[in-house]
Structures are given as C-alpha cells and as structure tokens.
Amino acid sequence: MEVYNFSSTLNPKDLIDWIGKLEDYFELEEIEDPLRVRLAQTKLKEHATLWWKELQIDREEEGELKISRWRLMVTELKEKFIPIDYVLELFKRF
C-alpha cells in the first residue's frame, strides 16, 4: 500500500483522504504511536512540512512536549488545513 504526500492543497478533502490512507496503512502494518507521527511527518511536503516543523518548535519553546500522538497530530492538521466553513457545510448535509 502506497501512502502519498500531503502538501496542503486548497481542497480539504485531500487532507481527509490522506489521513484515511495513513490510518489504513497504520492498521495494516500494526504501527502504533509515536511511530505513526514520525512516519506521517515524513509525508508532509512544502507548506505543510514548514508549518509542522514550526508548530513543533513553538511547542518546545513554550515548554510543551512535541506532538507524538497520532490523534493530536490529526487534530492539529484539521484545525490548520480544514476551514470552518467546510466543516459547517458538511454538518448541514448530514
């Protein structure tokens, strides 16, 4: 199973699909935290990787631990790359 890169496109569905593919891969290969985060961050490219590195640096400078839990990484990615109006539109549909 190939897991493709994520480079912060304008389409929020790209992130949702990317997360789903990674979760399928993690389950198939029986990969657990914190290796999930380390593998996922290698698949971030361009703006997404710059943002992730800056987030991790900011956390360290504020005395917090770097993110090492997959669920927290997913939350941060969604907050950054999925606009609230997209979430509201999905909520209205269902």
Where in this protein do the model-derived segments appear?
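Retroviral Gag capsid
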Residues: 1-94
